[in-house]
């Protein structure tokens, strides 16, 4: 399990620095199943989780929602039958902050 899971998201300001390009590979190694994607020129973290039923997918989505409230950092979530797509990025800075990697690692830890 990644050390990121043990960390807490910090309050993010509009002038907070984005994750630097040279930091990205090391952070991605800690969440190996997450894919960096770019949409609307914004770098984000994305992962699809698969489940055997809609109710399992909803249960997982609710766990993410609870964690997101506790961390005060919220993802985009697409819920479908047997599938939950989670995308993390920091709106205030229009890109990736360390909080996104912490939240991605915590999301992985909820999928038990």
Task: Show the residue positions of the predicted features.
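Long, contiguous binding/interaction regions
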Residues: 1-34, 38-112
